[in-house]
Amino acid sequence: MIKYLTALATCFLLAPFMLVAQIPQYYSNVDFNLAGDGLKVELSSLLLDTHTNLIPYTSSNTDTWDVLRISDLVEANSSNVLLIYGYDDSDSSTNNDRTRDIYSNQSSNCIGYWNREHVFAKSLANPSLVTNQPGPGTDVHNLRAADCQMNSSRNNRLFVSGSGNSGISGSYFYPGDEFKGDVARIIMYMYLRYPSQCEPLNIGVGSSSYSTNGDMPNVFLDWNEEDPVSDFERNRNDVIYSYQGNRNPFIDNPYLAFKIWNGPVPLDSWGVLSSSDLLTQTVSVFPTITNDYLYIKGTNPSQRSVKIFNQLGQVLEFELNGDKIDVSGLPKGLYIMNIKVSSQSKLFKFLVY
């Protein structure tokens, strides 16, 4: 976010020109003055309209294997692919390897080989993703090279928050610190590209209180901010774009996730969207620790809506009188307030003691 008022004013005045100059041509027909569902619908339509080439899963012609051998290279001119969820090439185990030769691949579960991981697990889509014909199940944006055994360990486990290397956590799976942002941005892409088939609530564990409609688990929005886009992801996005015709917008700019679903504020890769969101920067709530009242500053009471969530994501009842909120009836604990003005939202955390 830009912090100085003079800079903010300048950016606000120049925003229409900056948007044209710095946002990639691929997004030229998207209205980035929109937020929330409006922006989500426009991006969803773009991904559908530009997905002009459906890649077969396995074929004597160009198939998903061929694309992954290029898109998932560790780096240019490398002979190894990067294995999602992997973290150690130096020990005697192969299931946790981070890289592997591009031709050490098999379609079946084989020790020491890599195969194709569906990040949005096939069985968690509704209907399930299939690979016997080109379509949602063969969308390469959702496929990653993975060690066969690691792929089997992940299986169709839902993703859950964690830390450190990847691994099973109870009945869930943590993708690892290196890959959690990758996973989040793939899940977001799949939701926009196949909105009724690949709903994030079916694959992520925990509250979805950040998003106004409760349709995006907080864990993915957290990961999108905590694990920034890597050069590997950017190159992969370019390669898949050259084959399929469409892009993953959350790799191009992770800030788009914030504009649609709120949550933590990630980097604005284009440097123009965050500076245009001046409305959300003018709203404030105080105090953040209280046992009686909160006050809202910077909005007209008749033009806003206010919701308060507990840590389970449940919407709570409260008394609102103009800019004054009575929270004295809430139990002690941490809460999230969502203030929405027009199509923009802003979240605030506060503690009741």
Task: Walk through the language-model features, giving the residues of each.
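Bacterial Sec-dependent N-terminal signal peptides
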Residues: 1-25, 275, 347
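C-terminal tail/sorting-segment detector
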Residues: 4, 318, 334-353
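N-terminal module-boundary/linker segments of secreted carbohydrate-active enzymes
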Residues: 22-93
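Domain-level detector of nuclease and nuclease-like folds
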Residues: 105-271
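Residue-level detector of functionally pivotal "anchor" positions at catalytic/ligand-binding pockets or at interdomain
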Residues: 264-286, 299, 304
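Short coil/turn motif common to extracellular beta-sandwich-like domains
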Residues: 287-295
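Short, glycine-anchored, charge-dense loop/turn motifs used at functional sites
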Residues: 308-316, 335
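Glycine-centered tight-turn motifs at strand-turn-strand junctions
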Residues: 315-330
